[in-house]
Amino acid sequence: MKKRLLAAVLAGIMVFSMAGCSGTNSDSASDNGTDTQAGDTDSDEEQTEIQVFIAASLNTVMTDLAERYNEDHPDVKITYNADSSGTLLTQIQEGYECDIFFSAAQKQMDDLEADGLMVESTRANVVNNQVVVVTLKDSGTAVTGLEDIGKAESIALAGGSVPVGRYTRQAMVNLGMLPKADDVAAITTEEVSEALGGVEISEQDNVSKVLTAVVEGSCEVGTTYYSDTYGYEDDLDILQTVSYDLTGNVIYPIARVINEEADDAQTAAAEDFLKFILSDEAKEVFDSYYFDTNVE
């Protein structure tokens, strides 16, 4: 089984230490899958490390939550691997060590469960999100929302295997902009471009990269999550908040992953951290980062 050090295969490593970094967005969005470590201390006390795979759109809020958790549990080191849910699922299926999977869509969690990789009775829905169409503030774009997004000179769009890309494609199908498909995730970026009259589309492999493309001005518009606009209120205009009637609910499920390498301390730490994520205290934090915690 591949060991914990995903840094060897993932570009763009960010190390978060309780003493040195804040849990807020930096000036530019993260544009790579990242490993984030929380819970480092200066004491000689041995720490128990848990591996938590999180959708890229959860990076900021989960860093904050880890900081809060470590105030009472300094003996636990939480190592995050943040990327698209599809990429994370593939890594788990390939044998990367993981204790908790927090996905941005039900499909990836369904696949995890079907593969027998989930700890039974640990799955829970945590938050809901919403797809938004964004542009740089005062960009002067002619685009007003998804229905006329083809007016843009360039679009940042996540691939179909990325939840936000799939939700965007589903909305476009429901608007009649794309033909119906058994699996909207299979609609290629080239097909989307063709349906929009040949507009230039920059395909991104996670939602953070979509945000980066818009914030840095390399694309005129993009589709991301409402929660991703946290910290960018002065930089971005939300052109449209896409209705759930078009996308369906954007539910984020969480579950523990079977980890045969974990010892008793690691298993207990993973169980306790999952309980914390589902707590009322954590719900208040999610709410503050623009997530909707009114889910079943």
Show which residues each predicted segment covers.
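C-terminal motif of bacterial Sec signal peptides marking the signal peptidase cleavage site
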Residues: 16-20
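Exported/periplasmic ABC-transporter solute-binding proteins
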Residues: 22-67, 86, 106, 114, ...
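Signal peptide-proximal N-terminal region
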Residues: 68-79
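Positively charged n-region of N-terminal signal peptides that target proteins for export
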Residues: 1-5, 10-12
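Short, high-confidence coil segments that cap the C-terminus of an alpha-helix
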Residues: 75, 97-98, 219
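Ligand-binding clamshell of periplasmic/extracellular solute-binding protein-like
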Residues: 80-90, 97-113
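A short, gly/pro- and small-residue-rich
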Residues: 115-123
